[in-house]
């Protein structure tokens, strides 16, 4: 979900506008917010920070180019938050379908227009220009090869994994996968809020009834190049098609197990287990769709661990990709609250380290080359 300002910004980038073309204001979404200040014991608060001192951690889905739109804070302030929160790395995502999107009265994003050829690719390219600058400000080294991660961790450097959310920017051209790979992108989320040339989405009725032939070609090309396929926003038939096409494990960067809400962006246990069955990872998502707290988010993580096992769970905050009034995090100073709350809930230190980054390190080193 997104405030109108972010769509205006994406469309402006599609017109080669300045990165300062932010439109002020945010939509009052009909969802409930909550802060993520931990209620963990003082001992576990200290122990949670110690986990982050000793083990690499990563946020698997963020949009730092939108920080100023929502939080009214600068990227320099977020750089200080990264340091204070002991974050080891982050996926920095452009939005591939941004120029097509608008907001329904209920706050739901949808594809409202069909951009002219080249607009979505151009917008994504310019967003990546912005994200490159943000990575430098955040003190992050781009991961381009599998060995880059181990080298950065050994050197106590933070890592940026450049990503695009929504394969719409490919505009049906397989050669664009190679172009963005050469540009430094190492993860593509196949679909977002527009039913595109690759497949259907969770939030609209099916059109293709799964992954398209072009979608299968994109998955295979990403495997060949050494890119991580992200299946967030993809319904079960698309995930099944991607699994059949892929020779490597994949990621669902931000979702939760749907046991009670009926929220379209959550997934069934069968869906989650399919992703995990090939070694994949699912990012637990701290979104508040009802009165929620840090404890509710830990419930989501525990439900996911119970479903797929602790080796297949990570954290994807969607930081600044949704209005901060509907997620449980506003900046990375709150990152240590997650391991603290997990420890307080009875998770062991080794398992907490896996969830915070160890599982994603394994997945990245198995897929990125």
PLM feature spans:
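Acidic, glycine-enriched loop/beta-strand segments at the rims
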Residues: 311, 366-369
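Twin-arginine (Tat) signal peptide motif
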Residues: 14-23, 42-45
């Amino acid at each position: 979900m997104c405030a109108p300002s972010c769509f205006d910004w994406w469309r402006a980038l599609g017109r080669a506008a300045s990165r300062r073309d932010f439109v002020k204001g945010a939509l009052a979404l009909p969802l409930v917010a909550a802060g993520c200040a931990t209620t963990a014991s003082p001992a576990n608060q200290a122990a949670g920070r110690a986990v982050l001192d000793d083990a690499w951690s990563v946020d698997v889905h963020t949009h730092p180019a939108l920080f100023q739109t929502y939080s009214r804070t600068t990227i320099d302030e977020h750089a200080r938050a990264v340091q204070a929160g002991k974050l080891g790395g982050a996926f920095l995502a452009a939005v591939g379908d941004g120029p097509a999107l608008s907001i329904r009265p209920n706050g739901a994003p949808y594809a409202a227009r069909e951009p002219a050829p080249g607009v979505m690719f151009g917008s994504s390219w310019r967003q990546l220009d912005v994200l490159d600058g943000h990575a430098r400000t955040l003190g992050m080294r781009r991961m381009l090869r599998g060995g880059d991660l181990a080298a950065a961790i050994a050197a106590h450097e933070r890592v940026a994994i450049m990503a695009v959310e929504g394969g719409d920017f490919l505009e049906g051209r397989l050669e664009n996968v190679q172009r963005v790979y050469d540009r430094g992108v190492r993860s593509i989320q196949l679909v977002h809020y527009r039913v595109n040339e690759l497949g259907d989405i969770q939030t609209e009725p099916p059109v293709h009834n799964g992954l398209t032939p072009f979608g299968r070609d994109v998955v295979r090309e990403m495997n060949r190049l050494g890119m991580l396929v992200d299946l967030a926003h993809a319904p079960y038939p698309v995930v099944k098609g991607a699994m059949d096409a892929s020779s490597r494990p994949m990621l669902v960067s931000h979702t939760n197990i749907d046991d009670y809400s009926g929220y379209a962006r959550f997934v069934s246990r069968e869906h989650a287990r399919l992703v995990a069955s090939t070694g994949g990872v699912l990012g637990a998502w701290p979104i508040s769709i009802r009165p929620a707290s840090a404890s509710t988010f830990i419930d989501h993580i525990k439900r996911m661990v119970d479903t797929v096992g602790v080796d297949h769970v990570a954290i994807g905050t969607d930081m600044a990709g949704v209005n901060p009034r509907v997620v449980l995090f506003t900046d990375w100073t709150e990152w240590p609250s997650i391991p603290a709350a997990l420890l307080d809930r009875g998770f062991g230190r080794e398992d907490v380290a896996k969830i915070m980054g160890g599982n994603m390190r394994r997945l990245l080193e198995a897929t990125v080359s």
